[in-house]
């Protein structure tokens, strides 16, 4: 089974914030693939279905961002899914708004959701899809920025980035992640 995990914060308050682009991508995949997120277990909301003949699990950890690993580790253990089958989708301050970047491993880069995931998985070697949200300007605190809504100017770029992230997830069903990474990272 392949797992696509979108990181974010639960609840209406955070629904359309920069920190929730991972959740937005999972919602997009849920619609496209007709996989309802109808299960709640392991501190996560998830659904299981078949896409292109492959069994797929979509999950949104409901632990709040900084504790995301507390959902992912037990979920992988319960379904006996190797870490190699996991793709984590999340926001990245170090990428320009709307840009996506795929990686096969790496540090948390200051992202607490990834830090928790690395800690609970016991490895930093898992596939990632990073969605750029840019950096705050005019002295705005990072926490206020990531928990803030996108501006009207940012909306189109973010919607396209979520679509591209979903396309990268879909491509990874048919091709090795490294090949998908090279393809999508080459796009400007």
UniProtKB/Swiss-Prot annotation:
GO terms for molecular function: peptidyl-tRNA hydrolase activity; tRNA binding. It is an enzyme of class 3 (hydrolase). GO terms for cellular component: cytoplasm. CDD domains: PTH. The active site is at 19 (proton acceptor). The keyword Hydrolase applies. Its main location: cytoplasm. GO terms for biological process: protein quality control for misfolded or incompletely synthesized proteins; rescue of stalled ribosome. The record marks 9 as: Discriminates between blocked and unblocked aminoacyl-tRNA. It catalyses: an N-acyl-L-alpha-aminoacyl-tRNA + H2O = an N-acyl-L-amino acid + a tRNA + H(+). It comes from the Bacteria. TRNA binds at residues 14, 64, 66, 112. Keywords: Cytoplasm, Hydrolase, RNA-binding, tRNA-binding. Transmembrane segments: none annotated. The keyword Disulfide bond does not apply. Its EC number is 3.1.1.29. InterPro entries: Pept_tRNA_hydro, Pept_tRNA_hydro_CS, Pept_tRNA_hydro_sf. The record marks 91 as: Stabilizes the basic form of H active site to accept a proton. It is found in: Cytoplasm. NCBIfam families: pth. Monomer. Belongs to the PTH family. Hydrolyzes ribosome-free peptidyl-tRNAs (with 1 or more amino acids incorporated), which drop off the ribosome during protein synthesis, or as a result of ribosome stalling. This is Peptidyl-tRNA hydrolase. The lineage of its organism: Bacteria, Bacillati, Bacillota, Bacilli, Bacillales. The gene is pth.
């Amino acid at each position: 089974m392949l797992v696509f995990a979108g990181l974010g914060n639960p609840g209406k308050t955070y629904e359309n914030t920069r920190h929730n682009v991972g959740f937005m991508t999972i919602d997009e995949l849920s619609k496209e693939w007709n996989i309802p997120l109808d299960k709640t277990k392991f501190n996560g909301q998830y659904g299981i279905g078949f896409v292109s003949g492959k069994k797929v699990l979509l999950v949104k950890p409901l632990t709040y961002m900084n504790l995301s690993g507390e959902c992912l580790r037990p979920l992988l253990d319960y379904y006996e899914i190797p870490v190699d089958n996991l793709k984590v989708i999340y926001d990245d301050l170090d990428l320009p708004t709307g840009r996506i970047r795929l990686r096969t491993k790496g540090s948390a880069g200051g992202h607490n959701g990834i830090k928790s995931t690395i800690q609970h998985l016991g490895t930093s070697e898992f596939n990632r899809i990073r969605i750029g949200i840019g950096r705050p300007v005019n002295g705005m605190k990072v926490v206020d920025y990531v928990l803030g809504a996108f501006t009207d100017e940012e909306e189109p770029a973010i919607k396209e980035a979520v679509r591209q992230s979903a396309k990268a997830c879909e491509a990874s069903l048919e091709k090795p992640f490294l090949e998908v990474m090279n393809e999508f990272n080459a796009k400007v």
